A protein has these predicted regions:
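Catalytic-center loop of serine/cysteine hydrolases
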Residues: 44-57, 62-176, 222
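Alpha-helical segment of the N-proximal tetratricopeptide repeat
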Residues: 156-184, 194, 227-250, 254-260, ...
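Helix-start (N-cap) detector for alpha-helical repeat units in TPR-like alpha-solenoids
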Residues: 158, 189-190, 223-225, 259-260, ...
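Residue-level recognition of tetratricopeptide repeat
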Residues: 166, 197, 233, 267, ...
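Solenoid-like repeat scaffolds
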Residues: 179, 183-184, 216-221, 249-255, ...
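Register position in tetratricopeptide repeats
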Residues: 194, 201, 237, 271-272, ...
Length: 634
């Protein structure tokens, strides 16, 4: 369905840029304040009826009021021209509609003015009169576009209660009004969604599920777009990413000019590693909002992960043109070049980012530049850049600069020196404000000891880490203690993991801990099954170690053909330094690339990767014996 959607979009003839219109709250010019609720109703009904109109993106009030926290609260019941105009501009409106209405002698009349906010010129005037707000609002919408969708209810009491909910000052009043709206028209979808969201925010998941289930039972009487929104809401509540994507795809087909839908769909595709589909979704978003810098940035990463590096660079250069004073475009360009193996280009871009803003990502671009040089095999050159990073941290009085030095020693192949430096740091930090860093350091030392083959030392270090652990270091300490337990069968490791991590909220950390334990025990077959499951639910950006570890287990179990694509991209270095579990994937990825190249009959490529692996491993081999095998294969 996803590809059919894009095929349909592609067949449409090119037209003018999409009009992004914000319909503001109307002003009541009539004599009765009891009619004030219609001001919001006009905005909501017209916006909803224009939602699927060709060439138009009608900006919902919920999006307009999203920036309230940054721009300050607005009196939501005030006329839109005074209270919402700046919000419309902040939401990217290229046209702003405002209006007034009055009820006299039982007849409702209204006028809508649409203007270009850049010039202040009026581009359209519309007026209508009828017996109720639905008829008048629909006529105004039809004068804006001849393709409008029917609103979700014809019940005035339901609409009035829903508008009261939208403008209520308290959660209790909002919920009461939403209940009234549902009671007045049980086939009116939006009140169900808003009420379910409030229940979920209050951690009342059962009530939220019941509301959405009730709404979906009646969804056959609702507009298709509303059904899709309800399905998406229910899928998100249940954590069903496949169903959420299906609902988003349906909604994108019904309302193809809504950038929020395309953004959510692109994010869904990214999380599912459907990168080409994410590229298409970001492009559709940019058709509506061509100056959306965040979308251009994300398009760059999506295209890079899809293997379309020229597309990635083009998107990021557009991003850079929009944000020339910022460091992030340079950092993103560095990431994309690093993914593609253009390591010197990546290094240069990271250095440019660090120069433009030394504080960006806590100074992490110098570290990334050092890693880019290291990945090229130039350890001495990488050391020079790493010293710049550490000196900058020392100048800024970073209390954990010594920790960073130890991490660099490890990742650049000085493993014994790294252990000595980090243990010295941990001992000095045990009794002061850096106690949690000491805990993490001992956990790191436990992992390093395990991969160097000293399980007894690892158990002692893990115990020290556990005794010092606090909220931010407890997870690492638990995993380190788990891994330092005596060797066992895969089934026994599973039992231990269930015992240590019994709660559903701990499933992720439990599964990763079990993977590391199985890899330490060379139990590659059960590890591959668990890694495949983890890899299926994570994007490459979320955890670059997963494809490398999965490729490792597949190579060890005779699936070299499946492993090769997983090793295509370089992992983007973290600005936070070396991962606690980096020994499981770096520099191992070069050894694995060497194995793949050897099996593919590419001896030169295999030798180059084996050499780089040996160079970055240093003189101290890890327990798996790959350094010796790489030396023998060269």
């Amino acid at each position: 369905m996803f590809f059919l959607l894009f095929a349909a979009c592609a067949r449409q003839p090119a037209g003018p840029r999409i009009q992004r219109i914000a319909i503001l709250r109307f002003e009541n010019l009539g004599p009765s304040v009891s009619d004030d609720w219609m001001g919001r109703a006009f905005s909501e009904v017209i916006t909803a009826e224009l939602a699927g109109a060709p060439g138009i993106y009608a900006i919902p009030s919920s999006r307009m009021h999203g920036p309230d926290r940054m721009l300050g609260p607005r009196p939501i019941t005030a006329p839109g021209i005074s209270a919402e105009f700046s919000l419309a501009l902040a939401s990217g409106a290229t046209s702003v509609g405002y209006g007034e209405y009055s009820v006299r002698q039982g007849r409702l009349s209204a006028r809508l003015t649409i203007e270009d906010p850049r010039t202040g010129k009026t581009t359209k005037l519309a007026s209508a009169a009828a017996g109720d707000v639905f008829a008048v609002a629909s006529e105004l919408a039809r004068q804006v576009s001849n393709r409008v969708a029917p609103y979700g209810t014809n019940s005035v009491p339901a609409l009035k209660a829903y508008m009261a909910a939208k403008e209520s000052a308290t959660t209790a009043a909002t919920e009461q009004n939403l209940d009234q709206a549902i009671a007045a028209d049980p086939d009116f979808g939006p009140p169900y969604r808003l009420l379910a969201q409030l229940k979920a925010q209050r951690q009342d998941r059962a009530a939220a599920e019941a509301l959405l289930g009730q709404a979906l039972e009646r969804a056959g009487a609702m507009p298709p777009a509303e059904r899709a929104r309800l399905e998406m809401e229910a899928a998100n509540l249940h954590g069903d990413s496949a169903a959420a994507k299906t609902a988003l795809t349906t909604l994108a087909g019904l309302e193809p000019n809504d950038p929020a839908v395309w953004s959510s769909l692109a994010e869904s595709c990214m999380n599912r590693r459907e990168y080409q589909q994410a590229v298409q979704a970001y492009r559709k978003l940019l058709d509506v909002e061509p100056e959306n810098a965040s979308a251009l940035n994300q398009l760059g990463y999506a295209a890079a992960y899809a293997g379309s590096f020229d597309t990635a660079l083009e998107a990021l250069r557009r991003y850079q043109a929009l944000r020339p004073a910022e460091a992030n475009p340079l950092d993103s360009l560095g990431d994309v070049n690093l993914l593609a193996g253009r390591l010197r280009e990546a290094e240069n871009l990271y250095l440019q980012a660090a120069k433009k803003d030394p504080n960006f990502e806590s100074g992490g671009d110098l570290w990334k530049a050092a890693m880019a040089r290291l990945m090229s095999g130039d350890v001495a050159g990488a050391d020079t850049i790493a010293r710049q990073d550490i000196q900058a941290r020392e100048a800024a009085k970073d209390p954990v600069a010594e920790y960073r030095k130890a991490e660099w020693s490890w990742i650049s192949g000085r493993r014994r020196a790294a252990c000595q430096r980090l243990e010295t740091f941990a001992r000095g930090a045990e009794n002061g404000p850096l106690r949690e860093f000491a805990s993490r350091a001992y956990s790191q030392l436990a992992v390093w000891s395990l991969v160097l083959g000293d399980r007894a030392a690892a158990a002692q270090l893990a115990q020290k880490g556990a005794l010092l652990a606090g909220p931010s270091s407890a997870g690492a300490a638990m995993v380190a203690r788990f891994l330092a337990e005596p060797p066992a069968s895969s089934s026994e490791w599973s039992v231990r993991a269930e015992r240590l991590f019994p709660n559903a909220s701990e499933n992720s950390i439990k599964n990763f801990a079990l993977v590391y334990a199985l890899l330490l025990g060379r139990q590659f077959q059960p590890a591959s099954l668990l890694l495949k499951e983890l890899y299926g639910g994570a994007s490459l950006a979320a955890d670059p170690s997963l494809p490398v570890m999965l490729a490792w287990t597949w190579l060890e179990t005779g699936r070299a053909g499946d492993a090769a694509p997983l090793l295509r991209l370089n992992p983007i270095p973290s600005v936070n330094g070396v991962s606690l579990f980096a020994p499981f994937y770096f520099p191992r990825m070069y050894y694995l690339r060497g194995l793949v190249a050897e099996k593919q009959g590419k001896p030169g490529e295999a030798r180059a990767n084996y050499q780089l692996f040996r160079q970055l491993s240093g003189p101290d081999p890890l327990i798996w014996g790959e350094e010796q095998r790489a030396s023998g294969a060269q």
